[in-house]
Amino acid sequence: MNSVRAANRRPRRVSRPRPVQQQQQQPPQQPPPQPPQQQPPPQPPQQPPQQQPPPPPQQQPPPPPPPPPPPPQDRNNAGERDDVPADMVAEESGPGAQNSPYQLRRKTLLPKRTACPTKSSMEGASTSTTENFGHRAKRARVSGKSQDLSAAPAEQYLQEKLPDEVVLKIFSYLLEQDLCRAACVCKRFSELANDPILWKRLYMEVFEYTRPMMHPEPGKFYQINPEEYEHPNPWKESFQQLYKGAHVKPGFAEHFYSNPARYKGRENMLYYDTIEDALGGVQEAHFDGLIFVHSGIYTDEWIYIESPITMIGAAPGKVADKVIIENTRDSTFVFMEGSEDAYVGYMTIRFNPDDKSAQHHNAHHCLEITVNCSPIIDHCIIRSTCTVGSAVCVSGQGACPTIKHCNISDCENVGLYITDHAQGIYEDNEISNNALAGIWVKNHGNPIIRRNHIHHGRDVGVFTFDHGMGYFESCNIHRNRIAGFEVKAYANPTVVRCEIHHGQTGGIYVHEKGRGQFIENKIYANNFAGVWITSNSDPTIRGNSIFNGNQGGVYIFGDGRGLIEGNDIYGNALAGIQIRTNSCPIVRHNKIHDGQHGGIYVHEKGQGVIEENEVYSNTLAGVWVTTGSTPVLRRNRIHSGKQVGVYFYDNGHGVLEDNDIYNHMYSGVQIRTGSNPKIRRNKIWGGQNGGILVYNSGLGCIEDNEIFDNAMAGVWIKTDSNPTLRRNKIHDGRDGGICIFNGGRGLLEENDIFRNAQAGVLISTNSHPVLRKNRIFDGFAAGIEITNHATATLEGNQIFNNRFGGLFLASGVNVTMKDNKIMNNQDAIEKAVSRGQCLYKISSYTSYPMHDFYRCHTCNTTDRNAICVNCIKKCHQGHDVEFIRHDRFFCDCGAGTLSNPCTLAGEPTHDTDTLYDSAPPIESNTLQHN
């Protein structure tokens, strides 16, 4: 459609007559300069007029030759022009220490001289291989007789005695081809004619650039700093590369063509007043298609490019700021089929319609690139004030431009729009402050976008949708009003090594069945989640750093899926990964750490496979599972948290298997309020509040775990909880093995409980568990203790080799027992009593023996004070004493806390005045964090 519209609306081009071609038809007595290979053979030294481009009179050697005919006004007073930089005027006296040893001195006469410069001296002259510079062919060697002849006086004076400053002044009036011919005269002229100051002045008069513009190959232009360039004369080198071209310079064409003698030798330069004329002229003249657009504002020209032309701005300073092409009615530039190798660079391109909201402008753009063309757009500033459409539109099969170093900013619509199977390479562009997305990719568009700076957009940074694709690498995307990168409706981009940060909402937003691969990016400091995945989307998030977000790291909700793998997620204000509302991602091999909230938060029926992650040093729980969620957590390392390792609450379910859970400030695992997870084959150790805590009607199937080295009980069961524990090894705890109290229940079956500091199993306060086929042995206190009106069913248990004894039942406890084996226990309590020792000797802050304890009315002790039977017999003999009960206790007499000293105990110990039961665990409170 675009091609048809362009063909119908394109005006007829009429090229201007070119006086240069007329000059070539003049009589042969004034032919233009010929290329080097067509020059006549060099003449002997006694014929100086044929060797020098501006030959002086033969009879007046002392004065310099008269200048050529007066140049036009812009060349008058070439040494004092206002538009020539001051450093050129200051250095025009000669090459100085740069290029020549000739400083304010004259050459002495030489008896002999060669007929032409040496090969080394030619290196300073023209090095171009093009026919545009009229170099003489290398001189042939002259005979010895010719070398013995004396040079003519004028030639000697010009070549050997005239000061460098005077020669440079003469050379300053020459054009480029004359300078190249002068460089062929002798070594001294070669050095002076290649003076960079001469070429800089000449270069700026033609091209206006204040820095050399290099053009080493088609489609490649770049400016350099002359001081840093390896070539001794970059101005001349650039002149050679840019020599053959057309110049759009309004007002100058008439002057140029009306002074053919003044510009003799510049047949390879064409001048036009408009870009349209230049486009037609270079095609009719069979030029290479190089067009220089000089400083100015060019308005409402119809620029439809359907040939491989090269169009570049030419201006001093920042070139693109001073060459402005604008259209108010139609697309400013349209590239059509046939413009495969076209180049447009170093200019400002604007689309500025009068009615900025008109719908018919929806198809109008600053740049429009259509099917089967691959132009290069380089170093351009692109602006559009139209509120519909886009600034740059690339559409159609075979549309494959290269857009690089451009600034697409401050547009009232989309910055760059790639659609309908278009491709292309887009590198090093600045895309900012656009009203809509910085980049749209739609309908199978598949660009390669590298190192672009996409920021401060008033919408999303990059938006791929409706099957849009693309490869985005090393882009900096930040401070956009919506997400930095949005993927929607089956779009499938690849985003690699980009920085996506400081978004006013999120970093990456994938929704409505979006896909995509996000690999090795840095995603940080976004106001919402670093990555959002929702509504059946299934992206791959691999190897990214996602950190310091004002909310969470990765947020998956609304049936979202995706692979979250190998990421480093840390320092976020909310959960590192959040999974909710039936979402089911795969989360593996990530590091989730140092968050201000939890590590992984699964809620509202969230699912997912969470495996082989390392979750550590988070402020709240390492993993939260709640409100009907059923994730599978497998082979993770969850450690060093400031609260719980894994926390199931409010009907949280799921599978927790083969994990290492260790070194948490609270319990390794907590289960409460109807939660019923399957916890199996885990290693749970180093918890400051115990291994597993099941409370507030918690459930759970806890099987084949190893629970050890916890500061408190290996497993706590309390407050109407009813879990099942099978085949676990619970050992080496710094408190009891399993503590059940406050109405706790549960089935404990086939567990090995050994080497714990307190009772292997402590049952207290109205609890009623079932213990079946357990082995409880090698404990540092009792095997099983039942107290505080608790009951239990004990069937087929083996209780042996425990220090205090096998089974201890407090007063008022009724137990159902069947087929238990209680054997070979050390019975340290009975032995201490039989030896008359105070039971304080065998107790400690973590180990309370169960025996008869008393109070002494004579010593005014209270119910909170307990005295062992031996202290009653020895220390309180004859006192009014009262038997309290048979229970776990700590002898206050032996501890030295009563008024009378104990005669059986050793050093007194400060009494904590606590109840004689295991210290209660710390329960997590989640309400304030939900």
Curated annotation (Swiss-Prot):
The keyword Iron does not apply. Residues 156-202 form the F-box domain. It comes from the Eukaryota. InterPro entries: Beta_helix, Carb-bd_sugar_hydrolysis-dom, F-box-like_dom_sf, F-box_dom, F-box_FBXO11, FBXO11_UBR-box, NosD_dom, Para_beta_helix_rpt-2. Pathway: Protein modification; protein ubiquitination. GO terms for cellular component: chromosome; cytoplasm; nucleolus; nucleoplasm. Keywords: Chromosome, Metal-binding, Nucleus, Repeat, Ubl conjugation pathway, Zinc, Zinc-finger. Residues 28-73 have a biased composition (Pro residues). It comes from Mus musculus (Mouse). The keyword Repeat applies. Its main location: nucleus. Residues 17-27 have a biased composition (Low complexity). GO terms for biological process: negative regulation of epithelial to mesenchymal transition; proteasome-mediated ubiquitin-dependent protein catabolic process; protein ubiquitination; sensory perception of sound. One of its GO terms (molecular function) is ubiquitin-like ligase-substrate adaptor activity. This is F-box only protein 11. A zinc finger (UBR-type) spans 836-907. At 9.5 dpc and 10.5 dpc, expression is restricted to developing heart tissue. By 11.5 dpc and 12.5 dpc, detected in liver and subsequently in muscle by 13.5 dpc. At 14.5 dpc, still detected in heart, liver and muscle and also in the developing secondary palate including the nasal, medial and oral epithelia of the palatal shelves. At 15.5 dpc and 16.5 dpc, expressed in lung, kidney, heart, liver, muscle and adrenal gland. At this time, fusion of the palate shelves has occurred, with expression confined to the nasal and oral epithelia. Residues 1-150 are annotated as: Disordered. Component of the SCF(FBXO11) complex consisting of CUL1, RBX1, SKP1 and FBXO11. Interacts with CIITA. The gene is Fbxo11. PbH1 repeats lie at residues 398-420, 421-443, 444-466, 467-489, 490-512, 513-535, 536-558, 559-581, 582-604, 605-627, 628-650, 651-673, 674-696, 697-719, 720-742, 743-765, 766-788, 789-811, 812-833. It is found in: Nucleus; Chromosome. Residues 117-132 have a biased composition (Polar residues).
